[in-house]
Amino acid sequence: MQAQIVNKIFEIFSKNNPKPQTALIYKNDFTLLVAVILSARATDISVNLVTKHLFETYNTPEKILALGEEGLKKYIKSIGLFNSKAKNIIASCQILIKNYQASIPNDFKELVKLPGVGRKTANVVLNCLFAMPTMAVDTHVFRVSKRIGLAKGNTTVIVEKELLQIIDEKWLTHAHHWLVLHGRYICKARKPSCRICHIKEYCEYYINTFAS
Protein backbone atom coordinates (compact mmCIF):
# COMPACT_ATOMS: atom_id res chain seq x y z
CA MET A 1 0.00 0.00 0.00
CA GLN A 2 1.30 3.45 -0.93
CA ALA A 3 2.44 5.75 1.87
CA GLN A 4 -0.01 8.49 0.89
CA ILE A 5 -2.93 6.08 1.20
CA VAL A 6 -1.71 4.89 4.59
CA ASN A 7 -1.48 8.49 5.74
CA LYS A 8 -4.99 9.18 4.49
CA ILE A 9 -6.36 6.23 6.45
CA PHE A 10 -4.79 7.43 9.68
CA GLU A 11 -5.82 11.02 9.04
CA ILE A 12 -9.40 9.76 8.98
CA PHE A 13 -8.90 7.73 12.16
CA SER A 14 -7.40 10.78 13.85
CA LYS A 15 -10.18 13.09 12.74
CA ASN A 16 -12.89 10.75 14.03
CA ASN A 17 -11.14 9.90 17.30
CA PRO A 18 -8.22 12.23 18.10
CA LYS A 19 -7.26 10.65 21.43
CA PRO A 20 -8.22 6.98 21.56
CA GLN A 21 -7.61 5.14 24.81
CA THR A 22 -7.51 1.57 25.98
CA ALA A 23 -10.85 0.14 27.07
CA LEU A 24 -9.16 -1.47 30.06
CA ILE A 25 -9.87 0.33 33.32
CA TYR A 26 -6.87 0.88 35.57
CA LYS A 27 -5.77 3.06 38.49
CA ASN A 28 -2.00 3.25 38.06
CA ASP A 29 0.89 1.80 36.05
CA PHE A 30 0.87 -1.47 37.94
CA THR A 31 -2.86 -2.08 37.53
CA LEU A 32 -2.60 -1.51 33.78
CA LEU A 33 0.06 -4.22 33.61
CA VAL A 34 -2.19 -6.59 35.56
CA ALA A 35 -5.20 -5.76 33.40
CA VAL A 36 -3.27 -6.41 30.18
CA ILE A 37 -1.98 -9.74 31.51
CA LEU A 38 -5.56 -10.70 32.38
CA SER A 39 -6.82 -9.64 28.94
CA ALA A 40 -5.02 -12.44 27.11
CA ARG A 41 -7.75 -14.57 25.50
CA ALA A 42 -10.37 -12.54 27.35
CA THR A 43 -12.50 -9.52 26.50
CA ASP A 44 -11.80 -6.12 27.97
CA ILE A 45 -15.33 -6.12 29.36
CA SER A 46 -14.77 -9.34 31.29
CA VAL A 47 -11.46 -8.03 32.63
CA ASN A 48 -13.01 -4.75 33.76
CA LEU A 49 -15.74 -6.62 35.62
CA VAL A 50 -13.21 -8.37 37.85
CA THR A 51 -10.62 -5.60 38.17
CA LYS A 52 -13.31 -3.15 39.27
CA HIS A 53 -13.45 -5.00 42.57
CA LEU A 54 -9.85 -6.22 42.68
CA PHE A 55 -8.25 -2.81 42.17
CA GLU A 56 -10.39 -1.12 44.82
CA THR A 57 -8.13 -2.68 47.45
CA TYR A 58 -5.31 -4.50 45.68
CA ASN A 59 -3.57 -2.03 43.39
CA THR A 60 0.15 -2.37 44.12
CA PRO A 61 2.57 -5.30 43.86
CA GLU A 62 2.84 -5.42 47.65
CA LYS A 63 -0.92 -5.60 48.12
CA ILE A 64 -1.33 -8.31 45.49
CA LEU A 65 1.39 -10.35 47.20
CA ALA A 66 -0.40 -9.91 50.51
CA LEU A 67 -3.59 -11.15 48.87
CA GLY A 68 -1.76 -14.25 47.68
CA GLU A 69 -2.25 -16.53 44.70
CA GLU A 70 -5.35 -18.28 46.04
CA GLY A 71 -6.92 -15.00 47.07
CA LEU A 72 -6.22 -13.53 43.64
CA LYS A 73 -7.83 -16.53 41.96
CA LYS A 74 -11.09 -15.82 43.78
CA TYR A 75 -11.23 -12.38 42.16
CA ILE A 76 -10.31 -13.47 38.63
CA LYS A 77 -11.87 -16.93 38.40
CA SER A 78 -14.42 -15.81 35.80
CA ILE A 79 -11.59 -15.09 33.33
CA GLY A 80 -10.08 -17.78 31.13
CA LEU A 81 -6.74 -19.26 32.20
CA PHE A 82 -7.17 -17.68 35.62
CA ASN A 83 -4.95 -20.25 37.35
CA SER A 84 -1.89 -19.53 35.22
CA LYS A 85 -2.61 -15.81 35.17
CA ALA A 86 -2.75 -15.66 38.96
CA LYS A 87 0.54 -17.53 39.20
CA ASN A 88 2.19 -15.21 36.68
CA ILE A 89 0.89 -12.04 38.34
CA ILE A 90 2.19 -13.12 41.74
CA ALA A 91 5.58 -13.99 40.24
CA SER A 92 5.70 -10.67 38.39
CA CYS A 93 4.93 -8.81 41.62
CA GLN A 94 7.87 -10.48 43.31
CA ILE A 95 10.20 -9.50 40.47
CA LEU A 96 8.91 -5.91 40.34
CA ILE A 97 9.53 -5.46 44.06
CA LYS A 98 12.93 -7.13 44.02
CA ASN A 99 14.37 -5.62 40.84
CA TYR A 100 12.40 -2.45 40.03
CA GLN A 101 11.35 -0.93 43.36
CA ALA A 102 7.75 -1.95 42.56
CA SER A 103 7.76 0.25 39.44
CA ILE A 104 6.98 -0.80 35.88
CA PRO A 105 10.11 -0.81 33.67
CA ASN A 106 9.89 1.25 30.49
CA ASP A 107 12.07 -1.15 28.52
CA PHE A 108 10.77 -3.91 26.26
CA LYS A 109 13.49 -6.42 27.14
CA GLU A 110 12.86 -5.92 30.85
CA LEU A 111 9.09 -6.18 30.52
CA VAL A 112 9.14 -9.50 28.68
CA LYS A 113 11.19 -10.98 31.51
CA LEU A 114 8.07 -10.76 33.68
CA PRO A 115 5.96 -13.95 33.81
CA GLY A 116 2.82 -13.58 31.72
CA VAL A 117 4.22 -10.67 29.71
CA GLY A 118 4.75 -11.44 26.04
CA ARG A 119 5.46 -9.23 23.08
CA LYS A 120 1.93 -7.88 22.73
CA THR A 121 1.52 -7.12 26.43
CA ALA A 122 4.88 -5.35 26.60
CA ASN A 123 4.02 -3.21 23.59
CA VAL A 124 0.64 -2.25 25.06
CA VAL A 125 2.25 -1.22 28.34
CA LEU A 126 4.98 0.81 26.64
CA ASN A 127 2.43 2.54 24.44
CA CYS A 128 -0.19 3.28 27.09
CA LEU A 129 2.07 4.19 30.00
CA PHE A 130 5.07 5.74 28.27
CA ALA A 131 3.58 6.92 24.94
CA MET A 132 6.16 4.93 23.00
CA PRO A 133 5.50 4.36 19.28
CA THR A 134 5.01 0.62 19.62
CA MET A 135 2.59 -1.61 17.73
CA ALA A 136 0.86 -4.28 19.78
CA VAL A 137 -0.68 -6.81 17.40
CA ASP A 138 -3.71 -8.59 18.82
CA THR A 139 -6.38 -10.46 16.87
CA HIS A 140 -8.13 -7.23 15.86
CA VAL A 141 -4.97 -5.51 14.64
CA PHE A 142 -3.81 -8.64 12.82
CA ARG A 143 -7.13 -9.10 11.01
CA VAL A 144 -7.79 -5.45 10.21
CA SER A 145 -4.27 -4.74 8.97
CA LYS A 146 -4.37 -7.60 6.52
CA ARG A 147 -7.93 -6.90 5.41
CA ILE A 148 -7.26 -3.24 4.74
CA GLY A 149 -3.97 -4.00 3.02
CA LEU A 150 -1.58 -2.45 5.53
CA ALA A 151 0.22 -5.75 6.06
CA LYS A 152 0.60 -9.13 4.39
CA GLY A 153 2.46 -11.20 6.99
CA ASN A 154 1.18 -14.48 8.36
CA THR A 155 2.45 -14.00 11.92
CA THR A 156 1.89 -11.26 14.49
CA VAL A 157 5.61 -10.48 14.62
CA ILE A 158 5.83 -9.99 10.85
CA VAL A 159 2.67 -7.86 10.82
CA GLU A 160 4.07 -5.75 13.66
CA LYS A 161 7.25 -5.08 11.68
CA GLU A 162 5.29 -4.28 8.53
CA LEU A 163 3.06 -1.81 10.37
CA LEU A 164 6.00 -0.08 12.02
CA GLN A 165 7.57 0.35 8.59
CA ILE A 166 4.51 1.58 6.74
CA ILE A 167 2.84 3.83 9.34
CA ASP A 168 4.30 7.31 9.79
CA GLU A 169 5.72 7.79 13.28
CA LYS A 170 3.37 10.69 13.96
CA TRP A 171 0.47 8.20 14.01
CA LEU A 172 2.12 5.42 15.99
CA THR A 173 1.23 6.67 19.46
CA HIS A 174 -2.44 5.99 18.70
CA ALA A 175 -2.29 3.57 15.76
CA HIS A 176 -2.76 0.43 17.86
CA HIS A 177 -5.89 1.82 19.51
CA TRP A 178 -7.38 3.00 16.22
CA LEU A 179 -6.92 -0.40 14.63
CA VAL A 180 -8.30 -2.21 17.69
CA LEU A 181 -11.39 -0.01 17.81
CA HIS A 182 -11.90 -0.33 14.07
CA GLY A 183 -11.73 -4.10 14.34
CA ARG A 184 -13.99 -4.24 17.37
CA TYR A 185 -16.81 -2.03 16.10
CA ILE A 186 -16.56 -1.76 12.29
CA CYS A 187 -14.22 -4.28 10.68
CA LYS A 188 -15.57 -7.29 12.55
CA ALA A 189 -14.27 -10.78 11.88
CA ARG A 190 -17.38 -12.46 10.50
CA LYS A 191 -19.39 -9.56 9.17
CA PRO A 192 -17.50 -6.30 8.61
CA SER A 193 -19.69 -3.21 8.43
CA CYS A 194 -18.16 -1.98 5.19
CA ARG A 195 -21.08 0.24 4.21
CA ILE A 196 -20.55 2.56 7.20
CA CYS A 197 -16.75 2.37 7.19
CA HIS A 198 -15.03 5.75 6.88
CA ILE A 199 -11.94 4.30 5.21
CA LYS A 200 -13.61 1.91 2.77
CA GLU A 201 -12.46 3.78 -0.32
CA TYR A 202 -8.87 2.99 0.68
CA CYS A 203 -9.49 -0.57 1.87
CA GLU A 204 -8.26 -3.37 -0.39
CA TYR A 205 -10.92 -5.77 0.88
CA TYR A 206 -13.76 -3.34 0.13
CA ILE A 207 -12.37 -2.38 -3.26
CA ASN A 208 -11.91 -6.01 -4.29
CA THR A 209 -15.26 -7.17 -2.88
CA PHE A 210 -17.71 -4.36 -3.55
CA ALA A 211 -16.16 -1.70 -5.75
CA SER A 212 -14.79 -3.83 -8.57
UniProtKB/Swiss-Prot annotation:
* Entry keywords, A to Z: 4Fe-4S, DNA damage, DNA repair, DNA-binding, Glycosidase, Hydrolase, Iron, Iron-sulfur, Lyase, Metal-binding
Database matches in Pfam families: HHH (PF00633), HhH-GPD (PF00730)
Residue ranges of the HhH domain?
Answer: 108-127
**What does the cofactor section's free text say about binding?**
Binds 1 [4Fe-4S] cluster.
Q: Name one GO biological process term.
A: base-excision repair, AP site formation
Q: Which PROSITE patterns match?
A: ENDONUCLEASE_III_2
Q: What catalytic activity does the UniProt entry give for this protein? A: 2'-deoxyribonucleotide-(2'-deoxyribose 5'-phosphate)-2'-deoxyribonucleotide-DNA = a 3'-end 2'-deoxyribonucleotide-(2,3-dehydro-2,3-deoxyribose 5'-phosphate)-DNA + a 5'-end 5'-phospho-2'-deoxyribonucleoside-DNA + H(+)
- Which SUPFAM superfamilies does the record cross-reference, listed alphabetically? DNA-glycosylase
Listed binding positions for [4Fe-4S] cluster are: 187, 194, 197, 203
What NCBIfam families does its record include?
Answer: nth
Q: What's the protein name?
A: Endonuclease III
For this protein's source organism, the top of the classification is:
Bacteria, Pseudomonadati, Pseudomonadota, Alphaproteobacteria, Rickettsiales
